[in-house]
Amino acid sequence: MQIILLKKIINKGNIGDKIKVKAGYARNFLFPKKIAIIASEKNLKFFEKKRKILEEQSKYENFKLKERFRNIKSLKEIEIYCKAGSKGKLFGSIGANHIIEKIKERGIRIMKNEIKLTNGPLKTIGKHNIKIKVKSNMCTEICVILKNNI
C-alpha cells in the first residue's frame, strides 16, 4: 500500500515521503494515529499544500524542545529536604515525582519518563547525580542534594 507520511518515522521516512508499507500496518497503526494518509492523486495535491504547514510545525516543536532542554541544562543542582536517621539513611526514599516537584518550583516543565535514576530511588543524605534525557541526543546531568531537615 502506498502512503504519504505526515510525521517523521525512524527507519521509514520523513514528512511528505511516499513509501510502501503493508496494509495492516497502515490501517491499524499509521492511519488511526494520523501519521500517514493514502497516496491517491487527491491526497498528493492536498498534501503539497499541507506539507509547508507540517514542516513549520515540526521546526517549531524542535525549537520548543531545544529551549526546554536549555532550561533544564541551566539547572545545576536542586536541594530537597527530607527526614533521615542519624546515619544518613532516609525514612522512605526520593523518587522521580519528588524531583519533578522541585524542578517545577523553578518553573521548568519535565516529565517522569525523562528522569533516569540509575540506582533506583535515592535513599541516603548527600549529593546524587541524576540524568535527564529529553530526547535521544539531548541528555544532561543535574545534582540532587538531599539534606536532613531535623
Swiss-Prot record:
Keywords: Ribonucleoprotein, Ribosomal protein, RNA-binding, rRNA-binding
SUPFAM superfamilies hit by this protein: L9 N-domain-like, Ribosomal protein L9 C-domain
GO cellular component: ribonucleoprotein complex; ribosome
Disulfide bond annotation, renumbered to this chain: none
Superkingdom of source: Bacteria
GO biological process, one term: translation
GO molecular function, one term: structural constituent of ribosome
Pfam families xref list: Ribosomal_L9_C, Ribosomal_L9_N
Function field: Binds to the 23S rRNA.
Family of this protein: Belongs to the bacterial ribosomal protein bL9 family.
HAMAP family, alphabetized: Ribosomal_bL9
Protein name (database record): Large ribosomal subunit protein bL9
Species, as recorded: Wigglesworthia glossinidia brevipalpis
Lineage: Bacteria, Pseudomonadati, Pseudomonadota, Gammaproteobacteria, Enterobacterales
